[in-house]
Amino acid sequence: MISLYLENGLFLQAQSFGASGTQVGELVFNTSMSGYQEVISDPSYKGQFVVFSMPEIGVVGANSKDDESFFSCAGILVRHYNEFFSNSRADFSLSAYLKERGVLGICGVDTRSLIKTLRHHGCLMMVASTIEHDKNKLEEILKNAPRISHSPLVSSVSAQKITTHQRTAFDFKTLDYKPFDEKTSHKIIAVLDFGAKGNILNELQNVGLKALIYPHHTKANELIKAYEKKEISGIFLSNGPGDPLSLQQEIEEIKQLINAKIPMFGICLGHQLLSIAQGYPTYKLKFGHHGSNHPVKNLKTNAVEITAQNHNYCVPEEIEEIAIITHRNLFDNTIEGVRYKNAPIISVQHHPESSPGPKESHYIFKEFVELLKGF
C-alpha cells in the first residue's frame, strides 16, 4: 500500500508497484500515449510526480538503453499497471525498473479525476509514502518540505566535469543507438548542462556536431576563451528542471555569452534562461505543458507540428521587442520559439528531439548547424 497527500487536502491510498520510501514533489500530468521510460528518466522531471493520462502502463516493459539520463522523477501515478510486458527490446518489467532507480510507482488511482484536479487547481505539491500512512503526519511532512522553486534541482542533475557524449541517434535498422564517429563531426559545441536529455545530445551529434558537455556553473570567461581560440563553434543551453528564475548565477554568466555574440541554441529551460538574461522574465503556467501531442505552428512556413513538451514556465510576449517569434502553441498561443535580432541565437520551448514523440521538429537542429556556418 502507498498513501498520498496533496496540498489541497486530498488524501488517497493506492497500490505500490515501484520503490519503497517517502517522496515529496510537484504533481504534474503527462498526455503521452507511449515512451514512459523516456519520461521517467527525463532530468526535467526531477522533483516531480507524473500522472499519466494513458490508462494502461507497463506493457512494453523497460530496457537498459532508452534512458534519457541517470536521474528520475520522484514517482509515477497510473490507472492500471500491467506486469506482463512484451517487447523484443525489453530487459525487465517497469516495476523492476522503478525499484532499481528508486522511483515510487502508484497504481489503482483515478488518474482522470486527478488530472481534472490539476487542471482546476494547477500544479500541486504532494507527498507519497509506503512507510507513513497517517494523514496528519503526511500533511506535516508536506508542510515542512521546500517548494520545488526553492530546491537546487539543476545542480543535482548537471554534469560535474567536462565530458563527451558517445552516441548519436537511434537506428531503426539495427534497433540500437549509433556510436559517435569523430570523422562525421564538423564543428564542436559546448553544451551547458542544466539536465540535458540524452536524445538531445544524440540529435546534436547526428547533424555533424560534437557535443562537449560542461557543468551548469561553468564561467562565461572559460567558454568565451574557448570560442575565441576556435576550440568551440557555439553553445547549446539544455533543458532542465525547476524554476529558471532560481538560477541567478547562471543567468549572469549567460548575459556575458550573449554580449560576446557567440552563436547559441536553447531548448526548454535553455530557451527560458536566454529570455531572462536579456531582461524578459518567465511566468509560470497553471498546469504546464507535458506530453508528446502538443500542436505548434511554425510561423514561417505555417505548418503545424505535433511536438513533445515538458515545461511549467514560458517566456513573455514582450520578448518580441528583441526577437522574431518563430513558433506558437496552438493550445494556448504561448511562445514556442524565437530568433533573436540582437545576437546569433535561436531557441525553442518544445523538444525537437522528441523522445518520446513525433519527429516533425528535428529540422531545428539543422537550423542550428546553418547558424554556426556564418561564424
Q: Which residue ranges define each predicted feature?
A:
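Residue-level structural signal for beta-strand termini and adjacent loop
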Residues: 16-17, 55, 310, 340, ...
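RNA-binding accessory domains that recognize and position tRNA/RNA substrates
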Residues: 1-206, 212-217, 244, 355, ...
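Proline-centered loop/turn at the N-terminus of a beta-strand
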Residues: 104, 188, 263-265, 281, ...
